[in-house]
């Protein structure tokens, strides 16, 4: 600070308007994201309760994957509109054009890569941590989309082989 009470960058040491606006935008984005996940999770639970018992396995799985992909695309669009996230896909489109079974193994520190990959590639059968099937927000979409729990391991391997053979 200099003698006039301002710092060397020209500010007064207080909170700038930009910081306040950024904080408000992040608060709105956080609340919107939370609401989106909770409402979406509940809708997927309802969809799972309705579709899984009444639609054949492949039909309900295809519907679940389509709905989940749309939900993730919409979520990423929401975050982009709010100005908190921008996703660039490089090389991922090549995977969409491949034929036959394919293993995609993202290494996600915060589930973002799973959201981005599912939003971009159709018909994925994901292997997920079995405990996530106890999460009321995630269980509906994961079950409806035919995701494969990672435990027990021998069943995970069997289901994964079946999914690869189906393409």
Where are these regions (language model features)?
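A transmembrane-helix-recognition feature enriched in membrane-embedded lipid enzymes
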Residues: 15-88, 140-141
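Soluble catalytic domains of membrane acyltransferases
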Residues: 81-167
């Amino acid at each position: 600070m200099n003698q006039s009470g301002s710092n060397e960058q020209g500010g007064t040491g207080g909170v700038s308007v930009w910081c306040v606006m950024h904080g408000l935008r992040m608060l709105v984005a956080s609340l919107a994201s939370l609401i989106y996940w909770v409402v979406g999770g509940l809708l997927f639970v309802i969809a799972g309760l309705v579709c899984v018992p009444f639609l054949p396995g492949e039909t309900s799985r295809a519907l679940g994957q389509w709905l989940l992909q749309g939900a993730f695309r919409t979520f990423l669009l929401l975050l982009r509109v709010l100005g908190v996230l921008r996703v660039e896909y490089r090389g991922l489109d090549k995977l969409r054009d491949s034929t036959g079974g394919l293993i995609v193994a993202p290494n996600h520190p915060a589930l973002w890569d799973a959201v981005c990959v599912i939003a971009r590639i159709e018909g994925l059968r994901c292997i997920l941590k079995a405990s996530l099937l106890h999460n009321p927000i995630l269980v509906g979409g994961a079950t409806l989309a035919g995701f494969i729990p990672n435990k027990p391991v021998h069943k995970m391997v069997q289901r994964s082989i079946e999914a690869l053979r189906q393409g």
